[in-house]
Amino acid sequence: MITVERVDTTSKKDVERFVGIPFKLYAECPQWVPPLRADIRTMLNRDKHPFYEHSDADFFIARRDGEEVGRIGALENRRFNAYHDSHQAQFYLFECIHDHEVARALFNRVFEWARARGLNEVVGPKGFSPFDGYGIQVEGFEHRQMMMMMNYNYAFYPDLVEGLGFEKEVDFISTYIKLADFEVPERIHRVAERVKKRRNLTVHSFGSKLELRRWKGRIGAAYNRTFVDNWEYYPLTENEIDFAFSDLVLAANPKLIKVVLREGNIVGFILGFPDVSRGLQRANGSLLPLGLLHILLDMRRTKWISLNGVGIVPEFQGLGGNALLYSEMAKTVKGDLGFVHAELTQVAESAVQMRRDLINLGAKPYKNHRVYIRKI
C-alpha cells in the first residue's frame, strides 16, 4: 500500500527523513553529487529561506508498506506568477524509485495542493530561486553532476513524469569544452577591444572574497537587468540576492568572477566556479567533521571549471557585447589555474544565439535537463 504524508517542517525527524531519501536512492551512483544536508534543511525552513517572505511551499514523502520510496516539494512562487501573470505551481526535489504508482501518488498530492490554491498548471523541476538549477536530466547520464548547480537523476525519471501527462516546456543545455582544443578566434578578441573603446567599457576582476562581497548590490542589480527576457526570470528581492550571494561567495574563487563596467555600472558578468563535485561526494552531505576539508582541497586540485552565469544587459547584446563576453571567458578558463575541462552550465535553449556561438567556438552539448509542464 502506498501512502503520501505531508512533511511537518517544524519536526526535525520529518525533515531529516525528507532530506535523507536521495542519499539512499543514489548511494551506489558515481555520477550523483550529494547536496549539503544543511542546504536542503534551509529550503524547508520558513524562518530562514527568503522564498517564504513572498511565497509558499509544502513537502511530501511517499511510503510503501512503511518504507520511504519517494519525495516531492510543491511550490507557489507568487512573485514569479505576478511578474508573468501566470497561475503556476512548481515541483522540486522530486525523487522516486522506479515505480509509476509511487510517482503518480506523489504528483496527485501536488495537483491537489495546486488546485486548492487556484493554480492551473504544474511546472518543474524548478526550485526556490534561479540559482537552484532546472529540470529532469534527459541526456548525459554517464557524466557527473556539476556540484549543486543542476540535478542528477536516473534515466527512468523522464518516463515517470511523461507517463503522468507532463510535456516539455524548455530544455537547459550544458556544454563541454576541452580547453586544450578551445581557441577563440583572434577576430573576436579584436572586436572585443573595439567594443571596449567605443562604448567606454572596462573589465574588472576581483582580488578577494571581501572585495566581492562589497559588490553584492551592484551584481544583484545587474542580474535583475540582464535576464529580464529569460523564461525563468522574476525580479529577486534584496533578501533573495543577499541569500544567493552568500552561497556564491562561499563557492567562488574571486579570480574567476569578472564584471563588465560602464561608468561604474555593471553591464555584463562572467561567473566561474571551480568544480568541487569530488569534494562534495567525499563530504557526503556534511561539512563536519572532514567535509569542509575535502571541499577546500578539491577547490585547489580540481581540473574542472563551471561557467554558470554569463550575461550582458539587453542594450549591449548584438552590439559586440557577446564578443567581449567570449573573449573574457576564454581568458578566464585558460588562465593560470590549471583547468583542463570546462562546463557551461545550463544555458536555456531559448538563448539561441549564445548556444550557436558556443558550438561554433568548439563547445559540445553533453547534458540536457528538461523542465516539464502539465495543465491541471
Tell me what each language-model feature is.
Residues 81-165, 283-361:
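Acyl-donor binding region in acyl/amide transferases
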Residues 151-232:
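Acyltransferase donor/substrate-recognition loop-hinge adjacent to the catalytic core
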Residues 1, 177-180, 373-376:
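Short beta-strand-to-coil "C-cap" segments at the C-terminal boundary of structured domains/repeats
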Residues 1-42, 111:
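TRNA-binding/sensing appendages of the translation machinery
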Residues 22-64, 72-82, 211-311:
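A conserved beta-strand-loop-helix scaffold within acyl/acetyltransferase catalytic domains
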Residues 261-264, 270-276, 308-314, 325, ...:
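Active-site proximal loops enriched in glycine and acidic residues that flank catalytic Cys/His/Asp
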